[in-house]
Design a protein with these regions (language model features):
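Long extracytoplasmic/lumenal interhelical loops at the membrane interface
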Residues: 304, 309-328, 334-384
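Alpha-helical transmembrane segments of multi-pass inner-membrane proteins
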Residues: 146-179, 190-195, 199-250, 255-270
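N-terminal membrane topogenic signal
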Residues: 18-38
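A membrane-periplasm/extracellular boundary helix in multi-pass inner-membrane enzymes
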Residues: 158, 165-167, 264-312, 331-332
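Membrane-interfacial entry segments at the cytosolic side of transmembrane helices
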Residues: 140-149, 230-236, 273-287
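Membrane-embedded alpha-helical segments of multi-pass membrane proteins
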Residues: 56-75, 117-127, 208-216, 257-264
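Juxtamembrane membrane-water interface segments that cap and precede transmembrane helices
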Residues: 44-51, 185-201, 321-322, 362-383
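N-terminal hydrophobic segments of proteins, predominantly signal-anchor/transmembrane helices
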Residues: 34-51, 65-130
Length: 384
């Protein structure tokens, strides 16, 4: 697929380093099949994964996977080729169902949760299939889709700036609009997850790092050997997005994610066999660590964690016990280490592991009742 991308620039080579213009875009559309619009829409909506306009899924509401699926269906002949090339990936839903059968027989099946688990895997395959069809099989020019991707992320950053202004300038009608637009809003004071933070168009502020370092950064690395201008544009987008998010105090995770990404970049970009580069790399690593420490001091939540441990921040501690419950559930039924509890049955793992997780947290000097209370709360919510 990477080799295909090198050759996929025959149509829109004109003025590709200049600003995006309507003429190259229209030329691109006229030289491609009509169904390419579904691909372009899916790419444009990649930064939009937390609005009420998307399809509901646990912890996010994406739009792009459905559009990628439509593009795949429009190109079903090529989809068969893509499925053969990436057969192991396309067998994931089948493997998931087969492995889930023992858990379903033992613990029952939660139909809605199982459906969302399996459709989540189908969304992954739709995304993989659409990208393979477009850039590996059809080999469409990649510059126009990349322009759209960069523009859409700049737009989402602009939305975050407007959200931040609406919060700090107390523009309640605007803040209220965004609060209603987002499926789980972090905008105003009524948020049960902690308001007063811009979330751009993401499901949570903590998703910022996932987009920057899970989508844009790999693309930047791919572009380095193909087009330095686009690599630079992606780099500038990542840097501005990360710094802007930190300055606007959008979340704690972006501080940690940025430091980790910086450390990785320093390690990759230095030749550690060369003495001069080794000295420079060590200095850069020390500088990155200092930036991380400054980030901890500047962020109240990170400072609280550093001072009081895991329980210093409620959100951070919740991630610990909410993860520990199902992990301990594997210990309650060791055979589930091989098969799991079945797709959609993570709640059964939570119930089975809550007591053990509570004891473990108590032994570590933390509040073990939180792990038990989480499982009890879910039981009450489901009416058990």
């Amino acid at each position: 697929m990477n080799q295909a991308c090198v050759h996929n620039d025959t149509i829109d080579v004109g003025n590709h380093h200049g600003r995006p213009q309507c003429r190259p875009f229209l030329q691109f559309l006229t030289t491609q099949e009509r169904n390419v619009i579904w691909l372009l829409l899916a790419i444009a909506f990649l930064p939009v994964d937390g609005t009420t306009l998307g399809l509901y899924a646990p912890f996010w509401s994406p739009i792009s996977p459905a559009l990628f699926a439509v593009y795949c269906l429009c190109n079903w002949r090529q989809l068969r080729i893509a499925a053969n090339r990436y057969l192991l990936m396309f067998l994931l839903p089948v493997a998931c169902i087969i492995l889930s059968i023992p858990g379903w027989l033992k613990f029952g099946i939660h139909l809605n949760a199982a459906f969302m688990s399996i459709t989540g895997l189908l969304g992954v395959l739709a995304t993989l299939g659409a990208i393979a069809i477009a850039f590996d099989i059809k080999r469409i020019p990649w510059r126009t889709p990349l322009r759209i991707l960069i523009a859409s992320y700049w737009f989402s950053f602009g939305v975050g700036v407007v959200q931040w202004l609406s919060i700090h300038l107390h523009i309640k009608p605007l803040a209220g609009y965004f609060a209603h637009l987002m499926y789980r809003q972090y905008i105003n004071e009524s948020s049960v997850w902690g308001g007063g933070r811009p979330q751009f168009l993401f499901a949570e502020p903590s998703y910022i790092g996932m987009h920057l370092f899970g989508v844009l950064l790999p693309l930047m690395w791919l572009m380095r050997g193909r087009d330095r201008i686009y690599a630079k544009r992606l780099r500038n987008l990542i840097v501005v997005y990360a710094i802007g998010s930190v300055l606007m105090q959008a979340g704690t995770r972006i501080v940690l994610d940025s430091v980790v990404a910086l450390l990785v970049a320093i390690i990759v970009h230095n030749s550690w066999c060369d003495k001069k580069q080794r000295v420079r790399g060590i200095a850069q690593l020390l500088g990155a660590v200092m930036l991380g420490l400054l980030g901890v001091l500047a962020d109240s939540r990170l400072s609280s964690i550093a001072e009081n441990g895991a329980e210093g921040d409620g959100s951070f501690f919740a991630r610990i016990y909410q993860s520990l419950d199902p992990i301990c559930g594997l210990l309650a039924h060791p055979w589930t280490v091989l098969t799991g509890y079945g797709a959609g049955n993570i709640i059964n793992a939570v119930w089975a592991g809550a007591q053990h997780a509570g004891r473990l947290l108590n032994d570590l000097g933390m509040n073990g009742s939180a792990a038990v209370g989480f499982a009890v709360g879910i039981s009450n919510h489901l009416g058990r």
